[in-house]
């Protein structure tokens, strides 16, 4: 039984070698007398020359018949995949209908999903094929250690790409991913002063139309905001000017100094006063009705050295000091 398995393996390897070389064509020897029917049923017998396609264009009647593959015996289960692969490749070679690659010594690309077959070692037995991966491995029998290795079939010129998205025989190599196309953002341009003053000789421009309207009142002399306090007939061009004036009547002082208890009715007065403090910082000034947290400056280097030497630090500056 092992001899039969080795014979079938050697026949499959010989078929692959002949197809890769492209110039060797197996022909059945003349049938001896009385052995016509028995020789035709030999395992792996090549089809007769009449079944091979001619040099002319193939027609419906010139299609070669499919090779008859006998059912493998239970003991030869390891050789059946090799015989089946050899028969399928022989069928593809016979049904191509063109003999250009036979004359040039080139073999067509395998259509098993890979561009190059993967040869196996001569010493390593290959009794199992991987149907899931579809890798076409050529394995030599163990008994024939002097059998030459099967060369890989080169790709035929002009042949289409192998199905399955594989290129160059790389396993699992899909099509190259497209470059990441990040949409470009429009560069942020600073807002332009679109609202120009229409009066001749005035080149002022503003970002908002409300600011332009209040500016135009300086040209027209219009003062729509009037004080409604008793015995006060003052008018203003802007609403914030009226609110500032109204505090003079009520005595409200909403701007308080962060360094002393003094308060002021106008923010510019508070800023002018706060600058007199040596520890003043602009972040201490009240901003839009909310006082920011005053920033405490770190102690001076001389004070740190005096505290390290044992002498106590000098008196801390009082926030209630008013200049």
Swiss-Prot record:
Residues 40-53, 94-106 have a biased composition (Low complexity). GO terms for molecular function: chromatin binding; DNA-binding transcription factor activity, RNA polymerase II-specific; RNA polymerase II cis-regulatory region sequence-specific DNA binding; zinc ion binding. A zinc finger (C2H2-type) spans 195-224, 225-254, 255-282. GO terms for cellular component: nucleus. Residues 184-195 have a biased composition (Basic residues). Residues 54-73 have a biased composition (Pro residues). It comes from the Eukaryota. Keywords: DNA-binding, Metal-binding, Nucleus, Repeat, Transcription, Transcription regulation, Zinc, Zinc-finger. One of its GO terms (biological process) is positive regulation of sphingolipid mediated signaling pathway. Belongs to the Sp1 C2H2-type zinc-finger protein family. PANTHER family: KRUEPPEL-LIKE FACTOR 14, KRUEPPEL-LIKE TRANSCRIPTION FACTOR. This is Krueppel-like factor 14. It comes from Pan troglodytes (Chimpanzee).
């Amino acid at each position: 039984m092992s001899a039969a398995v080795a014979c079938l393996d050697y026949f499959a390897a010989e078929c692959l070698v002949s197809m890769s070389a492209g110039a060797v064509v197996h022909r059945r020897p003349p049938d001896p007398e009385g052995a016509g029917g028995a020789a035709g049923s030999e395992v792996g017998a090549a089809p007769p020359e009449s079944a091979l396609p001619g040099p002319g264009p193939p027609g419906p009647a010139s299609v070669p018949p499919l090779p008859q593959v006998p059912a493998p015996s239970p003991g030869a289960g390891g050789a059946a995949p090799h015989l089946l692969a050899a028969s399928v490749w022989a069928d593809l070679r016979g049904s191509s209908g063109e003999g250009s690659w036979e004359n040039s010594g080139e073999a067509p690309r395998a259509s098993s999903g890979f561009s190059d077959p993967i040869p196996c070692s001569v010493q390593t037995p290959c009794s199992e094929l991987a149907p899931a991966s579809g890798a076409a491995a050529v394995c030599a029998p163990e008994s024939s250690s002097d059998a030459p290795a099967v060369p890989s079939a080169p790709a035929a010129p002009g042949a289409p790409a192998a199905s399955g998205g594989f290129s160059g025989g790389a396993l699992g190599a899909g099509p190259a991913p497209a470059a990441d196309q990040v949409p470009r953002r429009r560069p942020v341009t600073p807002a332009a002063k679109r609202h120009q003053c229409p009066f001749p000789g005035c080149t002022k421009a503003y970002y908002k139309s409300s600011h332009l309207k209040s500016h135009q009142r300086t040209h027209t002399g219009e003062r729509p905001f009037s004080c409604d306090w008793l015995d006060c007939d003052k008018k203003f061009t802007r609403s914030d000017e009226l609110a500032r004036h109204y505090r003079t009547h009520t005595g409200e002082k909403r701007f308080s100094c962060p360094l002393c208890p003094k308060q002021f009715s106008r923010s510019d007065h508070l800023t002018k006063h706060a600058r007199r403090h040596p520890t003043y910082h602009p972040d201490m000034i009240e901003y839009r009705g909310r006082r920011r947290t005053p920033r405490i400056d770190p102690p001076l280097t001389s004070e740190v050295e005096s505290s390290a030497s044992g002498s106590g630090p000098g008196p801390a500056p009082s926030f209630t000091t008013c200049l």
